[in-house]
Curated annotation (Swiss-Prot):
This is Probable manganese catalase. It is an enzyme of class 1 (oxidoreductase). Its cofactor is Ca(2+); Mn(2+). Pfam families: Mn_catalase. Belongs to the manganese catalase family. Mn(2+) 2 binds at residues 67, 138, 171. Residues 204-225 are annotated as: Disordered. Mn(2+) 1 binds at residues 37, 67, 70. Keywords: Calcium, Manganese, Metal-binding, Oxidoreductase, Peroxidase. Transmembrane segments: none annotated. Its EC number is 1.11.1.6. Catalyzes the decomposition of hydrogen peroxide into water and oxygen. Residues 213-225 have a biased composition (Polar residues).
Length: 225
């Protein structure tokens, strides 16, 4: 069950220094993009349905729910940046849907105007694979927010981005902690138990491949030659 609280997450107040439709276009990436908030929410909530451990299930549900609140924050930021005047020319060659289709309403598209798709969502039913996917998702989302921060010269929007970026770091840390707790479960049960799984083929330099009757675990710092 979900309930909507009128107050934004953590008492957040979304503000902008001034209207800027181009900045709104950039922020659309984190609303309807492949590494955006809607994608994260749908991914974690969908994954939670097959998680048996109640503590981990709660983690997936809690973070997924928080991502929905992030989506609300991003959408409100876009709404303020778009202002009140419908004029596709102000976004140049950027995403024009909000000016010709949605009447400036934040739209479920990315910064190029491509619609959100469930193809962005990764669900395997394997707790280890899903956690690894989520760690990578949070890292990518952080990178996108860093790019946005560098390009958006609005201190209020930057404050919002900084908060969201830091929350991606928190989620990343939580998923990493969860991964440590299930390191011998799921697809990790028989991980690295055969000789083939311990080979590192040194294909980048001249010389023999790894051919050893007693292979050691792969190592990037000291490859067997």
């Amino acid at each position: 069950m979900f309930k909507h609280e009128k107050q934004l997450l953590n008492g957040m107040q979304v503000k902008v220094e001034r209207e800027n439709p181009q900045y709104a276009v950039l922020m659309q990436e984190q609303l309807g993009g492949a590494n955006g908030e809607l994608k994260a929410a749908m991914q974690y909530l969908s994954q939670s349905f097959r998680v048996k451990d109640q503590a981990l299930k709660d983690l997936f549900l809690d973070i997924g729910t928080e991502e929905l609140s992030h989506m609300e924050i991003v959408a409100e930021t876009i709404n303020l940046l778009n202002g009140h005047s419908v004029n596709y020319e102000v976004v140049g060659v950027g995403e024009v849907e909000s000016h010709v289709l949605s009447g400036l309403t934040p739209f479920l598209v990315n910064s190029s105007g491509e619609p959100w798709t469930a193809n962005y969502v990764s669900v395997t039913g394997d707790i280890v694979a899903d956690l690894l996917s989520n760690i990578a998702s949070e890292q990518r989302a952080k990178v996108v927010y860093e790019y946005l921060y560098r390009q958006i010269n609005d201190k209020e929007v930057r404050r919002t981005i900084d908060f969201l970026l830091n929350r991606e770091e928190a989620h990343n840390a939580l998923f990493r902690e969860a991964l440590n707790k299930v390191k011998n479960e799921g697809s990790n049960k028989d991980f690295g138990v055969t000789e083939d799984s311990k080979l590192y083929f040194d294909l980048s330099t001249p010389g023999r491949y790894v051919q050893d009757p007693n292979p050691t675990e792969p190592s990037f710092s000291n490859p067997r030659r």
